[in-house]
């Protein structure tokens, strides 16, 4: 099974080891993710739609964005919008996405790159295709996972980081 490693593990937020009070959870249902549209109209499949949040914690939701082959002028993004108390982890399989936020974070992520945004105490951000993708069209496909922050970190300082595909290597587990 592939594992993801980076040169400096300190670039990623810490995930605590499960405590003794935590137990393995069984799969309670298998569903088909409904299709819909997000933001200004980009296609998504929402994997956790209709699932009780208490069963998902620490996850909030996960969207598959695309896979879509846009024509010129078709790529869509989001308007400025707020987040608070969780993190978004966005992975781009194909295409390019631009992020900008009210904390000064942001950048362009593309094939194999990951964007990790901690909303913490609150942040405004926008996600949009870059101008060249809007002008020429092209393939876009990615995933975004929302991860709930523990109560003590809900008001933490917002932050943003890009993890480039070249910084990540795959290892095979035995």
Question: What residue ranges belong to the model's regions?
Answer:
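Catalytic micro-motifs at enzyme active sites that drive phosphoryl/nucleotidyl and oxygen chemistry
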Residues: 76-78, 103-106, 128-135
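A short beta-strand-loop-beta hairpin characteristic of the jelly-roll/cupin
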Residues: 90-111, 123-126
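Hydrophobic alpha-helical membrane-insertion signals
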Residues: 2-46
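Ligand-binding loop in jelly-roll beta-barrel domains
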Residues: 119-152
């Amino acid at each position: 099974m592939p594992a993801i490693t980076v040169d400096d593990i300190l670039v990623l937020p810490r995930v605590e080891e499960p405590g003794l009070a935590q137990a393995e959870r069984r799969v309670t249902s298998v569903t088909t993710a409904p299709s819909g549209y997000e933001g200004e109209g980009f296609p998504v499949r929402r994997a956790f739609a209709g699932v009780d949040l208490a069963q998902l914690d620490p996850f909030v939701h996960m969207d598959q964005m695309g896979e879509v082959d846009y024509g010129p002028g078709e790529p869509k993004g989001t308007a400025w919008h707020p987040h608070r108390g969780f993190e978004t982890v966005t992975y781009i399989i194909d295409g390019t996405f631009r992020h900008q936020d009210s904390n000064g974070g942001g950048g362009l992520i593309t094939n194999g790159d990951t964007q990790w945004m901690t909303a913490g105490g609150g942040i405004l951000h926008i996600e949009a295709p870059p101008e060249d993708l809007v002008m020429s069209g092209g393939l876009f496909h990615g995933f975004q996972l929302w991860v709930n922050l523990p109560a003590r970190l809900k008001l933490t300082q917002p932050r943003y980081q890009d993890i480039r595909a070249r910084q990540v290597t795959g290892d095979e587990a035995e």
